[in-house]
């Protein structure tokens, strides 16, 4: 009887320059890992889903990679890192469109790249570019333009959110609770400007100007702009509610520390107090901000029901009226789902930035 080829479970993730594969095999012995003709070959003795056996698999990559994989054995798995030949984002891992049954995305790894790692990587890239340009005798025009552009972008955002934060603070100190009810008419124009400009941040990540992951930036951009432009912007009845003050105040409180931190990073400055604030203040502010957004959605539901705005009727023969409030109720669930995902991501950022007790690997 011919022996059946056993394949282990493999999880993958990527960055612009690297591919990461996690092979679910424990107590691995005699691993044979190589890349020939752009195909990754893996064969090893280990304990997997089918017990202690020899497992193997082959993956033909979507695009060209460097033929020197780097792997690390742990007690529970094999971690493989493969360098892409061209720094770019792949739409899938393999050349064949149909994903192999043993292959799945490593969702934790897709969201784990922290700001601290990105800073170190950016600095290392900058150092290597500087050495290369010096050896070639070329000016650092592109590097300086990129740093100057990012510095100015973060400076403008910092000034915009600082104006909102200071304005709301001063008005509250002078007028007290009365300042809550005209917050929108006082600072909405500046908030519109800052949030429209935030689109650039997501574009920068998508095209590789920055090494930030696209997904967290996109989630925050879409969530905030939905609250600002749909909930507040289209409903005059919502614009004089106190919740607008709390949403705008919490957003600006978070961003003045985030953008000032990024701004100083562009000029290679590290102010430890600011760094600590950037990686700590989100712990109370981020959940409070999500809670304020949820309150604004809840308060808007009866208004949308009453006005019928954005509601529509399905065509014949169904002819069912679909209220916009139905989508708002779904959005409420998405707010708290996003809170969980981003809170977990931000916690890992902070833990990696300030270190953790290292677990002993046998």
UniProtKB/Swiss-Prot annotation:
Catalyzed reactions: a very-long-chain (3R)-3-hydroxyacyl-CoA = a very-long-chain (2E)-enoyl-CoA + H2O; (3R)-hydroxyhexadecanoyl-CoA = (2E)-hexadecenoyl-CoA + H2O
Highest taxon of the lineage: Eukaryota
Protein's membrane topology: Multi-pass membrane protein
InterPro entries linked: CS_dom, HSP20-like_chaperone, Tyr_Pase-like_PTPLA
Family annotation (Gene3D superfamilies): 2.60.40.790
Residues that bear N-acetylmethionine: 1
Enzyme class per UniProt: lyase
Keywords: Acetylation, Coiled coil, Endoplasmic reticulum, Fatty acid biosynthesis, Fatty acid metabolism, Lipid biosynthesis, Lipid metabolism, Lyase, Membrane, Phosphoprotein, Transmembrane, Transmembrane helix
An annotated GO cellular component: endoplasmic reticulum membrane
GO biological process: canonical NF-kappaB signal transduction; fatty acid elongation; JNK cascade; negative regulation of intracellular signal transduction; positive regulation by virus of viral protein levels in host cell; positive regulation of viral genome replication; Rac protein signal transduction; Rho protein signal transduction
Listed transmembrane segments: 150-170, 186-207, 218-235, 242-256, 280-298, 323-343
Ranges in coiled-coil conformation: 111-136
Residue ranges of every copy of the CS domain listed in the record: 5-94
One Pfam short name: PTPLA
Residues modified to Phosphoserine: 114, 135
Lumenal side: 171-185, 236-241, 299-322
Modified residues (Phosphothreonine): 7
Active site, UniProt feature: 286, 293
Localisation: Endoplasmic reticulum membrane
Family label: Belongs to the very long-chain fatty acids dehydratase HACD family.
Role noted for this protein: Catalyzes the third of the four reactions of the long-chain fatty acids elongation cycle. This endoplasmic reticulum-bound enzymatic process, allows the addition of two carbons to the chain of long- and very long-chain fatty acids/VLCFAs per cycle. This enzyme catalyzes the dehydration of the 3-hydroxyacyl-CoA intermediate into trans-2,3-enoyl-CoA, within each cycle of fatty acid elongation. Thereby, it participates in the production of VLCFAs of different chain lengths that are involved in multiple biological processes as precursors of membrane lipids and lipid mediators.
PANTHER family registered for this protein in UniProt: VERY-LONG-CHAIN (3R)-3-HYDROXYACYL-COA DEHYDRATASE, VERY-LONG-CHAIN (3R)-3-HYDROXYACYL-COA DEHYDRATASE 3
Subunit structure of this chain's protein: May interact with enzymes of the ELO family (including ELOVL1); with those enzymes that mediate condensation, the first of the four steps of the reaction cycle responsible for fatty acids elongation, may be part of a larger fatty acids elongase complex. Interacts with RAC1. Associates with internalized insulin receptor/INSR complexes on Golgi/endosomal membranes; HACD3/PTPLAD1 together with ATIC and PRKAA2/AMPK2 is proposed to be part of a signaling network regulating INSR autophosphorylation and endocytosis.
Protein known as: Very-long-chain (3R)-3-hydroxyacyl-CoA dehydratase 3
Lineage: Eukaryota, Metazoa, Chordata, Craniata, Vertebrata
